[in-house]
Amino acid sequence: MEAFLQKAKQASRAIATLLPQRRNEILRAMAGAIRESQEMILNVNALDLKEAQASGLKGSMLERLALDGPKIAGMARAIEEIAMLRNPLGRIVDGWVVENGLRIEKVSTPIGVVGIIYESRPNVTSDTAALCFKSGNVCVLKGGKEAKRSNEAIASVMQAVLKANNLPIEAISLLPDASREGVAKLVKMDQYVDLIVPRGGNALISFVSENATIPVIKHDKGLCHLYIHEEADFAKALPIVINAKTQRPSVCNAIETLLVDETIHERFLLELRPLLEEKGTEIRGCEKSLKILGGKRASEEDFHTEYGENILNVRVVKGFEEALEHIAIYGSQHSESIITQNHSIAERFLEEVDASSVYVNASTRFTDGGEFGFGAEVGISTSKLHARGPMGINELTTYKFKIYGEGQIRK
């Protein structure tokens, strides 16, 4: 492990000093290589799927694991889009001249070696590797065991392009020891690794947080809420509920809980019921919502659960303050939305809700680097320091101060 990480650290200088044009050429070559290797990648992914099904994996986890032609094409296209993004390095973030004439610039630089720990989705391998490469970083990737063959295939394709361009293959590499013990070692290797980014469930986040001596940016669960205020426009609210819950229930920016003001709950839920029935949504509700929607009684645990399935908690609240209190208790600081035509209530919601992304009259499904207009992301950070929300290439940089003098000495 130590020898492997030492090579990764050594590779960081070569990657950090590449010219932007050269970096983009290599990324485009990687995208082409992914397309050309489609058959090989799909064959090994089929083996992963077969083994996962035999081990009892099902539902959203299988959906995340599965690759097909369009997904491979999407992976390649994402790499090309990353190549087209503005160079995140060497940006003068701030600059000033102090009284003694020193000119100071705050300039963006690579972080160094980034360890990324994730589950199920093989496309995360290509996305995160490309983002790290574009931002001048070396990445050490640890995917889920269920996607082992798929991740190895994708990484090997990208490494072959590095090798063909006389660059160290350690710039994009998979952690050689993917066991729990291996992860525990990785997150303590602060002499070689500069940042750890875990994205996954509670168990993974807790394990990394408890064991790491390296700075961690958490990409925790998405316990997202949609609140229907008493002054909501139903024509907006109804399709937003359906989109936010049912378009892709397995993703972290899908809602898990719907909150509805008591003054409008009967009218609104009666209109919503046939739409949810059409989508086959399972309801877990409070006493008032169950009278209209049917379903099971929601438990305390349900409100703390990221289902990743087409299951929706529904709770009727007395008003704005109770909705905010519920979100504060059960939310994971990911994405929260209010539907209202009341401007002052909307502004209060935006100011008072503590989350990385807060919406008015829109679906939480937009919390995504591509939808925000800055390309693919490493994940959605629920941490508050350094990066929050979709973590793109700019969040994969740090900064240094460049100081220009003309012989000044401190007195």
Swiss-Prot record:
Q: Enumerate the catalysed reactions.
A: L-glutamate 5-semialdehyde + phosphate + NADP(+) = L-glutamyl 5-phosphate + NADPH + H(+)
Write down the superkingdom of origin: Bacteria
Q: Does the keyword Oxidoreductase apply?
A: yes
List its EC numbers: 1.2.1.41
Please give the PANTHER family that the UniProt record associates with this protein: DELTA-1-PYRROLINE-5-CARBOXYLATE SYNTHASE (PTHR11063:SF8), GLUTAMATE SEMIALDEHYDE DEHYDROGENASE (PTHR11063)
Which named protein is this?
Answer: Gamma-glutamyl phosphate reductase
MF GO annotations: glutamate-5-semialdehyde dehydrogenase activity; NADP binding
Instruction: List localization entries.
Output: Cytoplasm
- Please provide one cellular component term from the Gene Ontology annotations of this protein: cytoplasm
Q: Which family does it belong to?
A: Belongs to the gamma-glutamyl phosphate reductase family.
Pathway(s) annotated for this protein in UniProt:
Amino-acid biosynthesis; L-proline biosynthesis; L-glutamate 5-semialdehyde from L-glutamate: step 2/2
